[in-house]
């Protein structure tokens, strides 16, 4: 990502929930400052809660170098006092034509981990998209930038909701593929609806990795229903959490999932932070949305949904590799 910023010629749009002032954050800051010095228009959008441990001086340095920095939804006298919704999206768009989205934040945990005895980077996934879909990613950034810099409502508004966009990759450089940029908004449940549709139509497999898996009744029913129909349904979740209380909520769903034929694995490493799914070796989702109430129904999220058999095969291979480093749960703890 820093290399992409380093090669930018016109614009850099960076949207992050977590942006730490550690060695990783400093690398990004240096890359942004260097880009601004070259005359590149640089904008950084961060979430107020996500950066609560980052000193203000870190962002003052960026602003002083010509980088536009905006903080989404700081506390104030409005609905929910600015506690929710949060901007949980992770997005980088360079020159409006190339972008990265996924679950990766800017901090040392994604490089070295945070445990002292057994350091290992957090397991996460992002996807780099080039071509016409880059314009959709730029449009998605503009939506959130406008929400953060104007008086537009920070929650979802029926009159301001935009349709999900899709774009074919350039057939001269890529095999035909369809890329949909799905903007998760409060109350829209778009990724949840997509899972339910895919669960009803899947013929072979549904494999899901979710860092904070606290699904709704309808999501559980969609997955268990697919498993009862003979679809290979697999769920990968962490065994260690940066928020330990989430595990108690996740384990609550194991009994029903296992009883209906859904297979569950727990990642053995420090933290599995990915938010991905692959259906029938063809439909791949990579983004910031976890299957829990915050991710699906409350926060602003961003996911890329890609129809491509080659990418689907790669996603399945990556998933199987992760399972080799995980433990299958065969009984409720």
Task: State where each predicted segment sits.
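Charged, low-complexity intrinsically disordered terminal segments
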Residues: 1-333
